[in-house]
Every structure is written in structure tokens, then in C-alpha cells.
Amino acid sequence: MARPYMIFAVLTAWFFGCNAQFGFFDQMFGGGGGGGQQQQQPQNVRSDSVWYQQQYEAAQCSHYLCPGTLSCVHFPHHCPCAWEGVEEKIELGEGIAICASKGGWAEGEFAKKVELARKGML
């Protein structure tokens, strides 16, 4: 008569062991594993341009609206760099401005490199 109890005990231990193991994998691989306690993940920014177009169209500017920063300036070459902390801006003679990573160069080094490139020496 002890056999049915033994089989029941073995099956119960096996069931709870499997359940604990799969709960571990669910939690490890982002399945939640919390028994219904799922955390709300923030949504990524959409990959299409609709959001940007809405922001651009809603911006109030009576002069020139910079496409990269949505800043309102008097002339296109006055547009600021999007990441002023890590980018350096130079204005070219044709009313065009460009921004590039400072890259650890000394102050003004980017402008020198652009000038050399414009002369064909770089």
C-alpha cells in the first residue's frame, strides 16, 4: 500500500521541480515569471518620420527653422549643432555650416582640417 503514496510523492516533487526550473528560465529571459506581475516596459520611439514631421509643423518660427534641432534662427548657417557638448561647428563661406564630432582634437582643429580638405591638401 505504500507504493501509491511513494508514486504520488515522486510525481509531486517532479512537478514542483519542473515548475521552479521553468519559472527561473521565464524570469531569466524576460518572461516575467512573477505570476502575473509584469513590468511595463517603456516604448521605443517610432521608426517612421511622422513624429518628427508633427514636431516640425507645430514649431513656431518667423525666420528659419533648423531641421536638425528645430531651433529658430535668422539664417541657416546660424543653426546650432545638435550635440554642442561633443560637436564643433564651422561656417563655410557659402552660408553653410557643418557640425562634426570634436574627436579629442584641440580647439579649432576641426576647422583647420576642413580648410585643408577644401584646398585638396587632405
Swiss-Prot record:
Keywords on record: Signal
Secretion signal, residue range per the UniProt entry: 1-20
Keyword Signal: yes
Transmembrane feature ranges: none
InterPro entries xrefs: LCL2
GO biological process, any: ERAD pathway
Function: Probable component of the endoplasmic reticulum-associated degradation (ERAD) pathway.
Protein family: Belongs to the LCL2 family.
Protein name as annotated: Long chronological lifespan protein 2
Species this protein is from: Leptosphaeria maculans (strain JN3 / isolate v23.1.3 / race Av1-4-5-6-7-8)
